[in-house]
Amino acid sequence: MENQPKLNSSKEIIAFLAERFPKCFIAEGEARPLKVGIFQDLVEHLKDETQLSKTQLRSALRLYTSSWRYLYGVKEGAKRVDLNGNDCGELEAEHIAHARTQLAEAKARVQAQRAEQRAKKREAEGDKETSKRPAAKKPNPRRQAPKDGEKRQPRPQKQANQAPRKAPRQNTEKLTPVKDISVLTVGQSLKVNVGSSVMDATVLEIAKEGVRVQLPNGLAMNVRTEHLKF
């Protein structure tokens, strides 16, 4: 006997059983309920099949009996069959109710999975459309045109960052120039011209060539008579 290729999946085993026992295992269409204890019958008939283990056979039977087309066949009036397709008794009400429950749960799972897939697809399409759509630009506010008869208001001029310097306060007092230094005394207060400004000063020393005065900031300087005023 030639070595047969090893069966790797439950679907391959089901196809093998449908070919080996066509009156028991239905490859297409509504399946017939199997005889109670069909697993032991299969083990006995397939004991010489080296490409098939008991574990693989049990998994294949579990897949076959949980399929929708098998659960549809478990109904009132249906009869169980053996490996040769012979009737082996009617189904019990408990088995029929169990099959209906399994079928309803299987349908609910499929519907939930499909709904989840549709939701993910819509979400993915929405993200794709959002990424393609350019960001909307904010419209620039349009200036309202003046109505007939109204004058356009001039734009306010921007103020300079630096405040304008205050003009030096002019000394409005009427001063008398010093013509004779002999009238001056040490410690006397008077006015002195410093550049374009008139500042307070105190007499420190009187000499022939001029008068030495001290300003409020502590600076001492020699000043000619024509720059002094009362």
UniProtKB/Swiss-Prot annotation:
Q: Which UniProt keywords apply?
A: Chaperone, Cytoplasm, RNA-binding
Pfam families cross-referenced by the UniProt entry:
ProQ, ProQ_C
What SMART domains has UniProt attached to this entry? ProQ (SM00945)
Record's GO cellular component terms: cytosol
Per UniProt, the ranges with Basic and acidic residues bias are 115-132
As for what it does, the entry says: RNA chaperone with significant RNA binding, RNA strand exchange and RNA duplexing activities. May regulate ProP activity through an RNA-based, post-transcriptional mechanism.
Record PANTHER family = RNA CHAPERONE PROQ
The name under which this protein is listed is RNA chaperone ProQ
Source species of the chain: Proteus mirabilis (strain HI4320)
